[in-house]
């Protein structure tokens, strides 16, 4: 799906390690009004982020208008409200909704139900915390000809639950399990054209919820070439930033001809 599984640890995180990483990043990266603290796990799982480190992390984040962390919908412990009270800016919690497709949900085995996701959104809303969600394009169990529609249905579910921002992530292979699912004809790699279709339709479909396409490793998606990739990437970047449709450049390559056909 994504490559964050590469960075998970076999043992609980040692106290102080995350604080040191954050201090290093703040010293070496340009200033920004927002900060994402994505830790390849769940921010409010004390095995991943020791609870004793939360006040120190919040202290280092006082200058930011928005602090974004990732968390599982079923981890709803007191640390969430405590951390929200510590940070100076708005806290936003990102959750991997992924899909509402029943078969795909079973294959992904994220260990939460749609009701769990809704309950998490309601709980965060009660605490005054914004919600963000990740939605997968063509996860295992979703057929290619249905995948765009299922993304749009999943986005609608997120919107209904008050999610502020959804990121559409093309499902990627590479972790072993995905290769096995490919052999079983349960997973088909999505194309760049599908991602374009998703974003075009999504930004026209929601008034308040921001929808963006994840562009990392875009060159690994099928259906693009050296002639068209740069132009299509720039177009997606423009739509991500403006939340408005952007015209396609008229390019002479077989990829674009296939899309037009």
Regions found by a protein language model. Give the residues of each.
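Acidic (Asp/Glu)-rich catalytic clusters
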Residues: 25-30, 55-62, 80-90, 122-128, ...
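Active-site-proximal loop/turn and secondary-structure-junction residues that shape catalytic pockets
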Residues: 41-43, 73-75, 99-101, 137-141, ...
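Surface-exposed cleft-lining segments at the edges of enzyme active sites
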Residues: 68, 102-110, 137-145, 182-186
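Well-ordered, non-membrane alpha-helical segments in soluble/globular domains
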Residues: 12-24, 49-57, 113-117, 147-155, ...
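Auxiliary Fe-S-binding modules of radical SAM enzymes
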Residues: 165, 171-261
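Conserved N-terminal glycine/acidic-rich loop preference
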Residues: 38, 54, 63-74, 114-115, ...
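Core AdoMet radical
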Residues: 3-21, 25, 29-48, 60-76, ...
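Conserved C-terminal portion of the radical SAM core fold
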Residues: 115-177, 196-215
């Amino acid at each position: 799906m994504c490559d964050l599984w590469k960075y998970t640890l076999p043992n609980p995180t040692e106290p102080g390690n995350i604080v040191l990483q954050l201090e290093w990043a703040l010293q070496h990266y340009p200033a920004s009004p927002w900060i994402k603290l994505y830790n390849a796990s769940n921010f409010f799982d004390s095995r991943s982020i020791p609870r004793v480190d939360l006040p120190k992390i919040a202290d280092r984040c006082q200058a930011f208008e928005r602090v974004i962390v990732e968390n599982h919908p079923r981890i709803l412990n007191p640390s969430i409200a405590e951390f929200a009270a510590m940070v100076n800016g708005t806290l936003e919690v990102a959750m991997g909704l992924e899909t509402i497709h029943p078969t795909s949900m079973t294959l992904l085995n994220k260990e939460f139900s749609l009701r769990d996701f809704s309950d998490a959104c309601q709980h965060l809303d009660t605490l005054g915390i914004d919600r963000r969600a990740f939605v997968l394009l063509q996860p295992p169990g979703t057929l290619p000809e249905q995948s765009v529609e299922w993304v749009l249905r999943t986005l609608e579910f997120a919107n209904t639950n008050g999610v502020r921002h959804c990121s559409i992530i093309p499902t990627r292979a590479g972790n072993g399990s995905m290769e096995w699912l490919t052999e079983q004809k349960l997973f088909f790699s999505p194309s760049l054209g599908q991602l374009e279709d998703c974003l075009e339709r999504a930004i026209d479909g929601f008034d308040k919820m921001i929808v963006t396409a994840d562009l990392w490793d875009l060159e690994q998606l099928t259906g693009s070439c050296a002639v068209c990739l740069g132009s299509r990437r720039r177009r997606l970047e423009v739509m991500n930033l403006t939340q408005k449709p952007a015209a396609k450049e008229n390019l002479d390559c077989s990829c674009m001809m296939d899309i037009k056909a």
